[in-house]
Structures are given as C-alpha cells and as structure tokens.
C-alpha cells in the first residue's frame, strides 16, 4: 500500500479527494492532509509518505515551492509528486516538470484522470522495487561466489 499525503488549502477539496475514488482498491492509503507546503513538510518530519498530491496556489508555501524543497532534500527527494491545479497555464506545468513532478492534473479533478495518474505512480514504484530486488539478488550472488 502506497502512503499518500494530500495538500490543499481548501477543506472541501481535501474531503472531495478522499471520497473521489476507492484509494485502497487502487493500492493507496491516505495517511494525512495539510493546508499548505509548510504544514506538509512538518507532517513529513514524523510520518512517511510515498506520494504527495498538492495544489499549486496556497498561502505560506505553495505546491511548487514544496516540490522544490522535496527535490533538494536527501530524505524526501524520491517522494512521488502530483500537482492538482486550477491553472492551465503552461508556465506552471513547465515549472512542475522542471522539478520532476510525476503528473499535473487540472481541477476539477476527474476520477479517471486521477486513477490513471495513481496507476502510473504505482507502476513506477513497482519498477523501482523490482530494480531493488535485482540489485539485492546480484549482491547475494556475489557473496556466494
């Protein structure tokens, strides 16, 4: 089960995201929510998350700044990140891509687009796990030889 942190300054969006899909059926568990990027970073100090779904425009620290901070952090750089935005402006998407955002979904969030993005992340995680298994397998073989 991949752990998800939702980040949005609108409580009704957070509620809606929790109810939009069957998270467990898709292999995800919502472990928390935050109202802005700063709150998200505080959450991550005491909790683990594999994926963050974040709004772009929020007070205190926006989603792009959160993404930037995660990518320069040794501890958090590998967290998957999906932007949820009401802005179709290419500039925001370009900035998100620059910092290795895994997907960019326009609001209002459509169920199918969210499921598609989550499945893409789950696929990336499966590839990552398979590579780790192969690496461990090779190391075990090396020690036996």
What is each of the regions a protein language model found here?
Residues 45-47, 71-77, 99:
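Conserved phosphotransfer cores of two-component systems
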